[in-house]
Amino acid sequence: MKILGIDPGSRNCGYAIIEKNVRKTALIEAGLIKIKPNTLQYQITELCEGLDVIFKNHKFDEVAIEDIFFAYNPKTVLKLAQFRGALSLKILQLHGDFAEYTPLQVKKAVTGKAKAQKEQVAFMVKKILGITKEIKPLDITDAIAVALTHANNLCLR
């Protein structure tokens, strides 16, 4: 089963593709959709075009995204919500249904602690997948964690 995990953001959107079977889980690809500083419309277009490339190169059984976190700055929340809306629409157009997880759910699923730091999530992601090299930036490890969370939830169904 091929799962796409996405960690949306207004500067970078992390993505990860994992393959899960009965015996093991493997990381197929992970990276960033880099969003350059520009008008919001242009940034949303960049995000959607980045997703087009990912979906053109891969077929997925499942897609999961991390829900936006609470931010104190109302402008940040509005911008993230607009990115999230565009991302949701694009996934629905390209794939159909997708799963959503809060940051706390992802952290708890991967580390056992809902309040874990991003570095702890990165450490556990590497440990779970048997990866020795460093994965940077943390947007990528967050996306891998989203995919792993969804893979684990599918096993529980």
Curated annotation (Swiss-Prot):
Coiled-coil region list: none
Domain of life: Bacteria
InterPro entries referenced in this protein's UniProt entry, alphabetically: RNaseH-like_sf, RNaseH_sf, X-over_junc_endoDNase_Mg_BS, X-over_junc_endoDNase_RuvC
Entry note: cofactor: Binds 2 Mg(2+) ion per subunit.
Keywords: Cytoplasm, DNA damage, DNA recombination, DNA repair, DNA-binding, Endonuclease, Hydrolase, Magnesium, Metal-binding, Nuclease
Example GO BP: DNA repair
Location, primary (coarse class): cytoplasm
UniProt catalytic activity: Endonucleolytic cleavage at a junction such as a reciprocal single-stranded crossover between two homologous DNA duplexes (Holliday junction)
Cofactors (names): Mg(2+)
Keyword Lipid metabolism assigned: no
Pfam entry (one): RuvC
SUPFAM superfamilies registered for this protein in UniProt: Ribonuclease H-like
GO MF assignments: crossover junction DNA endonuclease activity; DNA binding; magnesium ion binding
Cellular component terms per the entry's GO annotation: cytoplasm; Holliday junction resolvase complex
Subcellular localization(s) per the UniProt record: Cytoplasm
rRNA processing keyword on record: no
Entry EC no(s): 3.1.21.10
Catalytic residues as annotated in Swiss-Prot or TrEMBL: D7, E66, D139
Residues bound to Mg(2+) 2: E66
Record: residues binding Mg(2+) 1: D7, D139
CDD domains, A to Z: RuvC
Described function: The RuvA-RuvB-RuvC complex processes Holliday junction (HJ) DNA during genetic recombination and DNA repair. Endonuclease that resolves HJ intermediates. Cleaves cruciform DNA by making single-stranded nicks across the HJ at symmetrical positions within the homologous arms, yielding a 5'-phosphate and a 3'-hydroxyl group; requires a central core of homology in the junction. The consensus cleavage sequence is 5'-(A/T)TT(C/G)-3'. Cleavage occurs on the 3'-side of the TT dinucleotide at the point of strand exchange.
Family of this protein: Belongs to the RuvC family.
Subunit structure and binding partners: Homodimer which binds Holliday junction (HJ) DNA. The HJ becomes 2-fold symmetrical on binding to RuvC with unstacked arms; it has a different conformation from HJ DNA in complex with RuvA. In the full resolvosome a probable DNA-RuvA(4)-RuvB(12)-RuvC(2) complex forms which resolves the HJ.
Name of this chain's protein: Crossover junction endodeoxyribonuclease RuvC
Lineage of origin: Bacteria, Pseudomonadati, Campylobacterota, Epsilonproteobacteria, Campylobacterales
Encoding gene (name): ruvC
